[in-house]
């Protein structure tokens, strides 16, 4: 049938483009990025320049007004382990239901943070995700808040300031931690860290001026990272520097783009947030509300290469004998949809929901996630939720599909007339097309009706792919049996007898059980209709399920399961509708024809 062929060909081309892009661009780029990351890490580890001497008892010397201190480029990189790097400085412990780590008293940095609920792999003994690491490590990654002063203010808190703990030495949701520092100009800085049960820290800085004259100083915050993800990001989502500030709104700078541009500085703002984001994790700063600040995104090449998102407030004036307080919120954790949305609403963080990259088609992707997540709460399994979502989508669009398949059935009835027209005007394509249109008009057939299943299938397919790819809720979400991660490809393979033969196979040969099921269901669905008379189209229909089986093998298992289940439902739906319309279902005849001996050309 003409329209059904168009249906499959359109779907095939759409998925083929995505698969070819993933196989020939994403995978090689990922491998190249992993190798580049390995080389860079080796280079960093070999780089052992002497650290600049620093007096641990003093604050950071006052830099020029309006500048933000950034991590020294030539500092020492330790080849020791993480534990040794942490032991090199005094610390305050962090212990919450979601986080564990410590605050470095040198600089009052958040540079040691692990996520309790997330591990590197699905293995039970897999280590927890290390989100933040000390600067001395090749994977240095931290958040820091400080001040910029002048000669009048004296030394103000910065990267090298050693703070004193006042009271409680452990930060938890119920026990804030207070740090203090006093300089020789009569300025006392009191910093209070508090944290909720999830991933949000609140840093409250009070500056008490005990001197005899007013002072002005600036508050800054920065998220600095020395490495970048080993696996390259794709156009499916953004990884790198990010922020939403002022009237310019969302700013996204991939690692490669900021390496080229070196620095980007949007206009001043009085609200918003900025930081660095990965696929599943992020570290962001939310400056004091209504306090004007200058955001910046930068890449530094002096010494160790590093990426930085930072802000610098306007001058904060503190009269003699008075005090001033500024507050900065720091998000450091997993990009869980519900928590991100709650922070945006409860804390009035403007468009904080954009920390999750829903893409241009967010109006489809977000409802798709909401539906899957809602069903998960009832079913307790994301795989079952995906299957239930497919049923609901099919049911919602059943009336439209009914009309579409009814039109296809009518097209089958006029198939003989269409063949006559093709034979009659075989050498005149223009007249053939005109005759076809006249036939459609006479028989009251809409040849475009068969496109509706395609129009519905493609956005659902891509939105589900996006949900599986970007949302942390799908990460390590099990289905049943061997599928322990719906966001990863099916780990089995036909070519090693599904694990019975202990051999490591290349990516292109990892044809698992679910891709095979998907291929079989696609084959059956295509055989529901007559074999195309055109030899080229017939060959496409014959080989398309095989090609798709190989292509889909590298996609997330959740997407392949959806595709196979959708094929099954489509077979059932098409069979019911065609039977109602009195159209012949060609499935059994086509299957029997596969086993019949084909006549030789001489016969």
From Swiss-Prot:
<feature type="transmembrane region" description="Helical">
    <location>
        <begin position="452"/>
        <end position="472"/>
    </location>
</feature>
<feature type="transmembrane region" description="Helical">
    <location>
        <begin position="540"/>
        <end position="560"/>
    </location>
</feature>
<keyword id="KW-1133">Transmembrane helix</keyword>
<keyword id="KW-0997">Cell inner membrane</keyword>
<dbReference type="InterPro" id="IPR001708">
    <property type="entry name" value="YidC/ALB3/OXA1/COX18"/>
</dbReference>
<dbReference type="InterPro" id="IPR038221">
    <property type="entry name" value="YidC_periplasmic_sf"/>
</dbReference>
<keyword id="KW-0653">Protein transport</keyword>
<protein>
    <recommendedName>
        <fullName>Membrane protein insertase YidC</fullName>
    </recommendedName>
</protein>
<dbReference type="GO" id="GO:0051205">
    <property type="term" value="P:protein insertion into membrane"/>
</dbReference>
<feature type="transmembrane region" description="Helical">
    <location>
        <begin position="7"/>
        <end position="27"/>
    </location>
</feature>
<feature type="transmembrane region" description="Helical">
    <location>
        <begin position="352"/>
        <end position="372"/>
    </location>
</feature>
<feature type="compositionally biased region" description="Basic and acidic residues">
    <location>
        <begin position="38"/>
        <end position="51"/>
    </location>
</feature>
<feature type="transmembrane region" description="Helical">
    <location>
        <begin position="497"/>
        <end position="517"/>
    </location>
</feature>
<keyword id="KW-0813">Transport</keyword>
<dbReference type="InterPro" id="IPR047196">
    <property type="entry name" value="YidC_ALB_C"/>
</dbReference>
<dbReference type="GO" id="GO:0005886">
    <property type="term" value="C:plasma membrane"/>
</dbReference>
<dbReference type="Pfam" id="PF02096">
    <property type="entry name" value="60KD_IMP"/>
</dbReference>
<dbReference type="GO" id="GO:0032977">
    <property type="term" value="F:membrane insertase activity"/>
</dbReference>
<dbReference type="InterPro" id="IPR028053">
    <property type="entry name" value="Membr_insert_YidC_N"/>
</dbReference>
<comment type="subunit">
    <text>Interacts with the Sec translocase complex via SecD. Specifically interacts with transmembrane segments of nascent integral membrane proteins during membrane integration.</text>
</comment>
<feature type="region of interest" description="Disordered">
    <location>
        <begin position="38"/>
        <end position="76"/>
    </location>
</feature>
<dbReference type="GO" id="GO:0015031">
    <property type="term" value="P:protein transport"/>
</dbReference>
<comment type="function">
    <text>Required for the insertion and/or proper folding and/or complex formation of integral membrane proteins into the membrane. Involved in integration of membrane proteins that insert both dependently and independently of the Sec translocase complex, as well as at least some lipoproteins. Aids folding of multispanning membrane proteins.</text>
</comment>
<comment type="similarity">
    <text>Belongs to the OXA1/ALB3/YidC family. Type 1 subfamily.</text>
</comment>
<keyword id="KW-0812">Transmembrane</keyword>
<keyword id="KW-0143">Chaperone</keyword>
<dbReference type="InterPro" id="IPR019998">
    <property type="entry name" value="Membr_insert_YidC"/>
</dbReference>
<keyword id="KW-1003">Cell membrane</keyword>
<feature type="transmembrane region" description="Helical">
    <location>
        <begin position="378"/>
        <end position="398"/>
    </location>
</feature>
<dbReference type="Pfam" id="PF14849">
    <property type="entry name" value="YidC_periplas"/>
</dbReference>
<keyword id="KW-0472">Membrane</keyword>
<feature type="compositionally biased region" description="Low complexity">
    <location>
        <begin position="52"/>
        <end position="74"/>
    </location>
</feature>
<dbReference type="InterPro" id="IPR028055">
    <property type="entry name" value="YidC/Oxa/ALB_C"/>
</dbReference>
């Amino acid at each position: 049938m003409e329209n059904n062929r168009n249906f499959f060909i359109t779907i095939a081309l759409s998925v083929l483009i995505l698969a070819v892009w993933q196989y020939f661009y994403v995978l090689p780029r990922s491998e190249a990025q992993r190798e580049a990351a390995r080389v860079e890490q080796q280079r960093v580890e070999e780089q052992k320049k002497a650290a600049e001497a620093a007096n641990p008892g003093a604050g950071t010397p006052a830099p020029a007004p309006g500048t933000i201190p950034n991590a020294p480029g030539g500092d020492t990189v330790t080849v020791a382990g993480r534990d040794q790097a942490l032991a090199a400085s005094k610390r305050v412990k962090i212990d919450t239901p979601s986080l564990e780590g410590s605050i470095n008293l040198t600089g009052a940095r958040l540079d040691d943070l692990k996520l309790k609920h997330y591990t590197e792999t699905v293995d039970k003994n897999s280590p927890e995700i290390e989100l933040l690491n000390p600067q001395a490590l090749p994977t240095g990654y931290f958040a820091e808040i400080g001040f910029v002063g002048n000669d009048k203010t004296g030394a103000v808190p910065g990267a090298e300031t050693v703070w004193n703990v006042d009271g409680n030495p452990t930060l938890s949701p119920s026990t804030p931690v207070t740090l203090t520092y006093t300089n020789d100009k009569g300025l006392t800085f009191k910093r209070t860290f508090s944290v909720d049960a999830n991933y949000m820290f609140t840093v409250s800085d009070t500056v008490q001026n005990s001197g005899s004259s007013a002072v002005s100083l600036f508050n800054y915050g920065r998220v600095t990272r020395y490495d970048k993800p080993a696996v390259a990001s794709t156009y499916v989502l953004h990884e790198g520097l990010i922020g939403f500030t002022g009237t310019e709104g969302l700013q996204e700078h991939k690692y490669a783009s900021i390496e080229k541009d070196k620095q980007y500085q949007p206009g001043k703002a009085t609200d918003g947030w900025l930081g660095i984001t990965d696929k599943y994790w992020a570290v962001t700063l939310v400056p004091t509300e209504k306090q004007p600040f200058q955001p910046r995104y930068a890449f530094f090449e002096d010494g160790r290469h590093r990426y930085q998102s930072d802000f610098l407030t306007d001058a904060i004036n503190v009269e003699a004998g008075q005090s001033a307080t500024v507050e900065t919120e720091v998000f450091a954790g997993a990009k869980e949809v519900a928590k991100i949305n709650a922070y945006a609403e409860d804390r009035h963080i403007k468009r904080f929901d954009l920390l999750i990259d829903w893409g241009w088609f967010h109006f489809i992707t977000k409802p798709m996630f909401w539906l899957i997540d809602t069903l998960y709460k009832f079913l307790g399994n994301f795989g079952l939720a995906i299957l239930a979502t497919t049923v609901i989508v099919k049911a919602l669009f059943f009336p439209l599909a009914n009309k579409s398949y009814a039109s296809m059935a009518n097209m089958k009835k006029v198939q003989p007339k269409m063949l006559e027209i093709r034979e009659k005007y075989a050498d005149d394509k223009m007249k053939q097309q005109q005759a076809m249109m006249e036939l459609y008009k006479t028989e009251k057939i809409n040849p475009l009706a068969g496109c509706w299943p395609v129009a519905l299938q493609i956005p659902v397919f891509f939105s589900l792919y996006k949900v599986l790819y970007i949302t942390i809720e799908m990460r390590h979400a099990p289905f049943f049996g061997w599928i322990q991660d719906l966001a990863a490809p099916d780990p089995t393979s036909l070519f090693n007898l599904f694990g019975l033969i202990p051999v490591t196979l290349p990516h292109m040969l990892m044809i698992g059980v679910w891709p095979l099921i998907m291929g079989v269901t696609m084959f059956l669905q295509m055989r529901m209709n007559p074999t195309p008379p055109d030899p080229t189209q017939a060959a496409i229909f014959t080989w398309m399920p095989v090609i798709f089986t190989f292509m889909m093998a590298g996609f997330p298992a959740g997407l392949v399961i959806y595709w196979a289940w959708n094929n099954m439902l489509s077979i059932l739906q098409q069979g019911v509708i065609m039977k109602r319309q009195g159209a012949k279902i060609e499935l059994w005849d086509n299957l029997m024809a596969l086993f019949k001996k084909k006549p030789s050309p001489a016969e």
